[in-house]
């Protein structure tokens, strides 16, 4: 039989969501339960487990508990820690600038281009700089797309050119001019030491130096990119995790149409 530890009848629990004091949800409302995972460069033993608990305490978690520890090799150990987060955030004070309020489907995007732009648009994309990863740019550009969302190559009214990975910014710009691109899409997967920020800034500087910045709708995407960061760097929009070709295409065609009519 259950001890009653989780019985709603034997214990007082918060049941109301307060948007001014939002906390993580574990088992019940406002309990602040969180799960944290990290690796320590230490052997797998009792001392390293205690080190993991103390790190969690210094992060502000109460009653931390190491629930899993596993050796990665002789000198490194992976930990999973549970704890209680006692702080909260005021959800009502959080304001985020969304890229798109309404996402068009592939068919709707094609129809929008026909009605408002009147010609095919050209999109050139690449993983620029030293980034050798193509998973991000392929998910947006390739015909098969990703997770049930077709890529830009399948769109009837979009000529999509995927230049692949490790494309120098200078070559990227040269190809964009050659293809008379309307939209440039930069994918950045590698983010160690903020190399993605440096590379994206370099592209902006090159475009501005050549007087080409306003010629293109300039977009970027990646696991550590959001719209706020993108706009701070000088891009028109940024797309992070959970975004698909639909999101990119919708913003691109609407922005292009606005510029043509301004």
UniProtKB/Swiss-Prot annotation:
InterPro entries given in the database record: Cobalamin-bd, Cobalamin-bd_sf, KamE_N, KamE_N_sf
Sequence positions that bind adenosylcob(III)alamin: 130-136, 185-192, 219-223, 239-244
EC code: 5.4.3.3
UniProt keyword annotation of Nucleus present: no
B12-binding domain residues: 120-262
Pathway participation: Amino-acid metabolism; lysine degradation
Names of the cofactor(s): adenosylcob(III)alamin; pyridoxal 5'-phosphate
Record entry for activity regulation: Rapidly inactivated in the presence of D-lysine and to a lesser extent in the absence of adenosylcobalamin (Adocbl). Activity is stable in the presence of Adocbl when D-lysine is absent. Adocbl imparts thermal stability at 37 degrees Celsius.
Keywords: Cobalamin, Cobalt, Isomerase, Metal-binding, Pyridoxal phosphate
Pfam families named among the record's database cross-references: B12-binding, OAM_dimer
Molecular function in Gene Ontology: cobalamin binding; D-lysine 5,6-aminomutase activity; metal ion binding; protein dimerization activity
Keyword Metal-binding in record: yes
Catalytic reaction equation(s): (3S)-3,6-diaminohexanoate = (3S,5S)-3,5-diaminohexanoate; D-lysine = (2R,5S)-2,5-diaminohexanoate
Record PTM N6-(pyridoxal phosphate)lysine, positions in chain: 144
Function statement: Catalyzes the migration of the L-beta-lysine and D-lysine epsilon amino group to the delta carbon to produce 3,5-diaminohexanoate and 2,5-diaminohexanoate, respectively.
Family: Belongs to the KamE family.
Name used for this protein in its record: Lysine 5,6-aminomutase beta subunit
The organism's taxonomic lineage, starting at the top: Bacteria, Bacillati, Bacillota, Clostridia, Peptostreptococcales
UniProt gene name: kamE
């Amino acid at each position: 039989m259950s001890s009653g530890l989780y019985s709603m009848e034997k214990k007082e629990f918060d049941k109301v969501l307060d948007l001014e004091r939002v906390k993580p949800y574990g088992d019940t409302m406002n309990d602040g339960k969180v799960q944290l995972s990290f690796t320590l460069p230490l052997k797998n033993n009792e001392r390293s487990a205690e080190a993991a608990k103390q790190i969690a305490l210094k992060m502000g978690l109460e009653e931390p508990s190491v629930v899993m520890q596993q050796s990665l090799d002789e000198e490194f150990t992976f930990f999973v820690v549970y704890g209680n987060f006692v702080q909260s955030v005021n959800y009502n004070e959080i304001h985020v600038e969304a890229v798109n309020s309404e996402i068009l489907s592939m068919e709707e995007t094609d129809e929008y281009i026909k009605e408002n732009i009147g010609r095919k648009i050209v999109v050139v994309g690449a993983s620029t700089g030293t980034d050798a990863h193509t998973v991000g740019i392929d998910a947006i550009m390739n015909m098969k797309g990703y997770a049930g969302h077709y890529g830009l190559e399948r769109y009837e009214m979009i000529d999509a050119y995927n230049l692949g990975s490790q494309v120098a910014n200078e070559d990227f710009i040269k190809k964009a001019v050659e293809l008379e691109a309307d939209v440039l899409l930069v994918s950045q997967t590698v983010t160690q030491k903020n190399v993605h920020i440096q590379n994206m800034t370099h592209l902006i500087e090159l475009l501005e130096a050549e007087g080409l910045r306003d010629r293109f709708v300039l977009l970027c995407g990646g696991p550590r990119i959001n719209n706020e960061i993108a706009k701070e760097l000088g891009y028109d929009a940024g797309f992070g995790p959970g975004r698909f070709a639909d999101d990119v295409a919708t913003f691109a065609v609407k922005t292009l149409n606005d510029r043509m009519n301004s």
